[in-house]
Amino acid sequence: MGYFIRVLGVYNDVIPLDELEAALERDELNATLSADQEDDPWSVIDVLSAKGSRLVQIEKNFVFPGCLAQAELDEFRLLIREHQPLSAVQWLDGYFDRIKVVYAFQVFDVAMIDDNYEVVSSLKRAIWGKSGGLLQNDLEGFSNDEGYHILWQFPDDITGDKYCAVLDNGAWVKFRMDLGDPFQRMAFWAGEVPQMAVRL
C-alpha cells in the first residue's frame, strides 16, 4: 500500500505537467508521468518507472471549507498535539492557516528499490519549489518552510542523521543531529539544540 508524504503549499499556482517532466530530465531521471486529464491543471498524476512499475501517485487538493485538504489540516492540528517539541506544535498550528493546497504523494513499495526514490524526491522538490510551505512525512513528522525537520514523529528505532531546527525567540536555529542518540532526542523534544549536534 505504501505510505504518504505531503507538500502543504502556500501558493496554489498551476504547475504544468511539462515542468515536472523537465525537472526529472534535469536530474537525469527516467520516468513517465500520466495525468488524469490531458490539459493542465491536473488533479492526479501516476508516476511510472522506466520498467512500467507505479512508483507514486500524486494527488492535488485545494484548501477550502468542507474539502478533503481542509479535513487533513484539521486532523493534523489534533495529531501534532501528541508530539514534540511544543514550540513546533504551536508554530505549525498557526502556519496551517496559510496553507492553500495539499499535494499528497502515495509512495508505493517499488519506489524503495534501486534508485527509484530519486524520482519521488525530484518531483517533491519541483512541486515544493513552486508551492512553498511545509513538508510532511508519515512516521517522521513535519519540516518547516525551509525544509528543516521540526516535529518528532519518528518510531523509537530510528537511526541516522537529520537536518533539524528548533525555535529560539521566534527564529529557527538549524543543526544536524543523530536521531538514534537518546540524549539528542530529549534535547530536541524539549525544543533545544542538542549539545552534540552540529550547528549549521
PLM segments and residue spans:
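Non-membrane alpha-helical secondary structure
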Residues: N12, P65-L68, E72, Q84, ...
